Curated annotation (Swiss-Prot):
Homodimer. Its EC number is 3.5.3.9. The gene is AAH. Residues 56-78 are annotated as: Disordered. It comes from Arabidopsis thaliana (Mouse-ear cress). Glycans are attached at residue 156. Residues 56-75 have a biased composition (Low complexity). Mn(2+) 1 binds at residues 167, 178, 281. Keywords: Endoplasmic reticulum, Glycoprotein, Hydrolase, Manganese, Metal-binding, Purine metabolism, Signal. InterPro entries: Amidase_Cbmase (IPR010158), ArgE/DapE_CS (IPR001261), Bact_exopeptidase_dim_dom (IPR036264), Peptidase_M20 (IPR002933), Peptidase_M20_dimer (IPR011650). It catalyses: allantoate + H2O + 2 H(+) = (S)-2-ureidoglycine + NH4(+) + CO2. Its cofactor is Mn(2+). This is Allantoate deiminase.
Length: 525
């Protein structure tokens, strides 16, 4: 188990009266005055049957306005479930949305959202998240990597814990849902169980984790938080430095977290103590919006390869070298990039597989392969000079590792052939390789059932099958898969936009995510 860090205790909002009536969330943060409507709900819930009868009699002679107000607060026979539904919705949707907005204001920049590993904003976010965890009845601590934990132990049951998490760091000029939604929806679901007096009914410990670093912006090293808990972070990673020459270890020590080689190793969770890991995350793509569904289950996270391609030719004067005599690396690079696009759009037309590459691999590539050239540079980069060298990057992702390796082999062969034909020198350097991570089938089925049940409760109708899709983006689940089985739930985002201030999730979809996690937790009782 991770060693708690002795940080100062955070202030707690009231566990029940913290913004549970939806109209209050449009104008206030979570720490403002509680709804008077809920106050009267509590008063009436404690009244005797005689008082309830008197209230009912009084309401019959009240004005239309009073009658409308009374319909929100009455807890008479037959109305308890409706009131509970409103309360749950207020926590899972309205309060969660308010908290997303509040956390989205915790930034290192005045003009945009920026919260990187161990920055001042990330330190300010820690007590805020801890306070929300404590509000949900969780015991909290901060570990030696700056991860924030909130845990509840069952009265009886298994010692193997269910971990639910996502990251609290952001990219530069970020949206407020990436990472934060997964943390807040889990906290909200557990708060509902606390309000209902059911936390103790869980059959295993549940631990919510807000990982300190997933994006890797500051140190160009992703998954610092989750990799430490999964036991896959090398000690040497502590010495990696940012642009200012500050190391990971220094950044932690500057914030009174005394990380050492020894206690980094102590952060690793014992696999026998963990039942599984679940992560809620915005899709960061357009599929759910396109199919018109708020939630989807992730079947796996794509494997990824990053290449650096360098093409060298003959540098010369733009006006004096005839076209037929040029060895132009720019036009050569352009042909390579067009080849990449063709291969990734129609992999079966280019793939020359060995016996390992079967029909399933070809189909998987056709459905999941994506390729991107994200950077390109020339030397000497002058308008009147034929370049001497062009360098570009390739990001290639697919759910099928066998297919990814086969495509890379065939792509490289064809690239070298094009360079030879053009009398150019070509080098292909592999900069990063990560295998795909598959979600646990049984855990995915449970999440799918929970999502289906949540959406049925929200709409009152039986919904179509919950979509199952691949994640092209990396997530903390990739690191946690080295520790335990993993499952992920995607939430629809507008236009598929992420890593942008235009990133947006509908309030009802925020509520759907929280309700799905609540349904999943109830299946763990």
């Amino acid at each position: 188990m991770a060693v708690p860090h002795p940080s100062s205790s955070s202030s707690r909002s009231h566990p029940f009266l913290s913004h549970v009536y939806h109209t209050s969330f449009h104008h206030h943060h979570h720490h403002n005055h509680p709804s008077l409507v809920l106050f009267w709900c509590l008063v009436f819930s404690l009244l005797s049957p005689l008082a309830l009868s008197s209230s009912s009699s009084s309401s019959s002679s009240s004005s239309d306005s009073s009658s409308s107000s009374s319909s929100h607060i009455s807890l008479g026979i037959g109305e308890t479930e409706g009131t509970k539904h409103d309360l749950h919705q207020a926590i899972l949707r309205d309060e969660a949305v308010a908290r997303l907005h509040e956390l989205g204001q915790v930034s290192d920049a005045a003009t945009h959202l920026e919260r990187t590993f161990m920055s001042p904003a990330s330190i300010r976010a820690i007590p805020l998240i801890r306070g929300w965890m404590e509000d949900a009845g969780l015991s909290t601590w901060v570990d030696y990597m700056g991860n924030v934990h909130g845990r509840v132990e069952p009265k009886n049951g298994s010692s193997q814990a269910l971990l639910i998490g996502s990251h609290m760091d952001t990219v530069i000029d970020a949206g407020k849902y990436d990472g934060s939604l997964g943390i807040i929806s889990a906290i909200s679901a557990l708060k509902v169980l606390k309000i209902d007096g059911r936390l103790g009914e869980l059959k295993r410990p549940v631990e919510v984790i807000a990982f300190s670093d997933e994006e890797g912006v500051r140190f160009q090293s992703t998954f610092l938080g989750s990799a430490a808990l999964a036991g896959i972070m090398p000690v040497s990673r502590l010495e990696v430095t940012d642009k200012s020459g500050i190391s990971v270890q220094d950044a932690l020590k500057e914030n009174s977290i005394d990380i050492t080689d020894e206690n980094l190793m102590q952060l690793k969770y014992d696999p026998a103590s963990v039942w599984g890991y679940v992560e809620v995350h915005i899709e960061q793509g357009p599929v759910l919006e396109w199919v018109g569904y708020p939630l989807g289950v992730v079947k796996g996270i794509a494997g990824q390869t990053r290449l650096k391609v360098t093409v060298k030719g003959s540098q010369g004067h733009a006006g004096t070298v005839p076209m037929s005599m040029r060895q132009d690396p720019m036009t050569g690079a352009a042909e390579l990039i067009v080849l990449l696009e063709s291969v990734c759009k129609n992999p079966k037309d280019y793939l020359s597989c060995n016996v390992q590459c079967n029909e399933d691999t070809v189909e998987s590539l056709a459905n999941s392969l994506v390729c991107t050239v994200g950077e390109i540079s020339t030397w000497p980069s002058a308008s009147n000079v034929i370049p001497g060298q062009v360098t570009f990057t390739v990001d290639l992702r697919t759910i099928d590792d066998v297919g990814r390796k086969a495509i890379l082999h065939d792509l490289s062969t064809r690239m070298y052939q094009i360079c030879d034909k053009r009398s150019l020198l070509c080098s292909i350097e592999r900069k990063h390789d990560a295998d795909a991570v598959m979600s646990d089938p049984q855990l995915s089925l449970q999440l799918k059932s929970a999502a289906q049940s949540a959406l049925k409760k929200m709409t009152g109708e039986v919904q179509d099958e919950v979509p199952v899709l691949m994640s092209g983006a990396g997530h903390d689940a990739m690191a946690m898969a080295h520790l335990t089985k993993v499952g992920m739930l995607f939430v629809r985002c507008r236009g598929g936009i992420s890593h942008s201030p235009a990133e947006h999730v509908l309030d009802d979809d925020v509520g759907a995510a929280g309700l799905a996690i609540l349904e999943f937790l109830e299946s763990q009782m």
